[in-house]
Amino acid sequence: MPKYSTEKWWARSSGRLCELARVAISMLAIAAVGVLQPALAAAPKAAASKATEPVMPDLSPWLQKNGEPGQAAWQHAAHFSIAYEIDPGHNTPAPASTQVDAGYTADALWLRFEAQDPHPADIGVHYRVHDGVNSDFDDFVGIFLSPFNDAQWSYEMFCSAGGAEWDAFRQQNNEYSSWDAVWSCTASRTATGYQVVMKIPFASIKFPHSPDPQRWGLIFFRNWPRNLRHQLFSRPLDYDSNCTLCSMEPTRTAAPVTTTPADIQLIPAVTVIRTDTRKDPTEGLAQGSPALKASLDARWVLRPDLEWSATLNPNFSEVAPDVLQLSANRQFALFYKENRPFFEQGTQVFNTPSLRFSSDTFNPSGTLVDTLAINDPRFATKLVGQVGANEIGALITQDTQTNIVLPGPQSSTSQSFDFSTRDELLRYRYDVGASAFGLYASDRDGSGYHSALYATDATWQIDPSDVLTALVGSSSTTYPGAVAGALGTTPGTIDGLLWTLDYARTRHNYNFDLNLSHVADGFRADLGYVPQVGYDQGAFTGEYDFYAPDEEWWQNFAFGTVSNWTRATEGGENLDRKVKLYTALHARYQSRIFLYATRDEQFYQGRIFTLDQYEMDAIAQPAQWLNGEIDVVGGDGVDYLGIRKAQLFSVNTTFYLQPGKHLKIDLVYDYEQLNLAGRRLFTANVYDLRFAWYFTSHLFAQVIGQGQEVRNNTALYPPGTPHHSGTLASQYLIGYQVNPWTVFYAGSSEGYEETVDGQLQPQQRSFFLKGSYYFQPSF
């Protein structure tokens, strides 16, 4: 790899940065007029209300010998009530009583929940590991905690009636369940319900670095699943607002929080794996040699609102595989969720407004930042924090394997290359109330390949109901000859511009969203997920809701539309014109039924296809131990390989079974077929079956089976098309989790592929041990 040069990077990028800066300054000036005026106008009202805000006391004087609050401490705590049902009721009295006591000590926030129940026997209690709580099955309580009280983001921490933890990060209306933290909770049954005690260490959260008392935003929450899933809040919700976090209750600490979080947090990890592979189709698996890999993650809390973290020789091997997605007859690259701890923690600051695609219903949105593009880094480091209203983020990695997606107006391709790249992400955002504006830059460089992207975005919360979002980005990408040849494109440098403007309104009975976008043919986001380029688009979504009176068998009925018009930037062809109408009914047994009718005019490879499709999606929980979803689609489709219209039929099913406290079964099955003039063109099946037995909330065993099978009618396809193909994979695993990063796993996995004679032949077998340990050293 050539030596990385900062001067070279700056020479390439400074001109484009200046160009984007001019655009950014214009956008920020426009945004400031609308953003700052209402924010400043609201300031006196906020100041005047501080005298009536709840105050959390320091519980340290009343701690027991074990360091935990006792009954005397809870009597001195601040008291709250989860008094409102926000769904299905609309700020109606909660059907079950929940009292919350809150306070803090030198190192942690402490919460106690007393959850009463009119029928205690109906409380859903199951063993789960961290993040295993299921809102359809489990009773749980918890908190939305916004330490900066800025209506921009919050932590979510919940504890089930069985003592299992679940946490997430909420950024405005987007929830990221992959975020994890080290905290603890205990749960115990009472004669009239259950009690939960939560301890949230200050070392695990980010909060303002201030000599004054903290002023945090809080909402306490209870999940109460019965015939309907009842969601209970400690604060009333404004249904004419699209800003949930604006409903938080400002709560002060009685004194400044003077604690300094743990300076250093370390997570060493070791993986031992042996992989046997088939080198000759006529022979068995050849036994491999055991390989040991050690890694170290480090987190340094510079101050409560700023942290630096790094990973050396990172261990990114996944214990459980992703749920399979059907890849047959798809236009664009599939999107997968990030599950690697280093990239899950603190990277939400890099998020930018999402993008819409035209005809790809399987991946309806994209993003400028997708850390899965960083495939196999030798090292990675990041700095993230929030100082007042300023949010900052910087991430640098050395990636040893480079994955590149070549997007297009109608399809995308991808290739993996063995050369290394230096990857950099930079983000700055300034928050003003629920509004914000920011700058973003990314750079990827190695072996003659280079991709740079600069962007600016702004969010203007005009009023509680209306929000305007804008994003402008510019990219420059250089493909050397070898890379261009593998991708099937022309060597050289290409540039492109992206912009998107979105206006959304939310009211109690209706909501709508209007979006305009432009993505140039030369635009690239190689450290993001943008598989479609070269289009202009207008899109509209809208819905109107009718709500049932209390005690009815149904909850609400809605009808709406999802429509878009997409035109190619090169040539001006209409790529896609779609109108989708739907109705939806929510009723008892947590049931939801959606009916869709779609007319779609789609342009592909020089042809226009007029497609009519009909869809039914049904979700229900007919029993306390069973939840399922069935989605059926029928009508017209496109055979993208043969470039012809066909008849489509697909069934997608998902079932979750919880027969008892210990056993959990998940089943996903997808079926799809295309027919041409009454003759079967292809049939595809995908299944994912998972059995898990939870001995406790820390110890579990799991078995996973996955398979994909495709059958093609070779008489209707070009010569060389295989008649059938199939894969099968299995995994056996036993795991023990103390917290998200102190874990031990042992297991094995096998992979099979279908041979030309239709037999499944083992191709790979692995045995693995993985352990990691989270600790805070004292120096």
Where are the model-predicted features located?
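N-terminal secretory signal peptides that target proteins for export/translocation
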Residues: 1-20
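Bacterial N-terminal signal peptides
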Residues: 21-35
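Structural preference for beta-rich elements and adjacent junctions enriched in aromatics
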Residues: 41-424, 429, 448
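Outer-envelope beta-barrel architecture signal
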Residues: 107-109, 153, 194, 212-216, ...
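Outer-membrane beta-barrel proteins
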Residues: 201-209, 243-259, 302-306, 346, ...
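Outer-membrane beta-barrel transmembrane domain signature of Gram-negative proteins
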Residues: 239-261, 400-454, 459-461, 592-651, ...
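Surface-exposed extracellular loop regions of Gram-negative outer-membrane beta-barrel proteins
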Residues: 260-309, 419-485, 551, 619, ...
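Exposed, low-structure sequence patches enriched in small/polar residues
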Residues: 376, 474-779
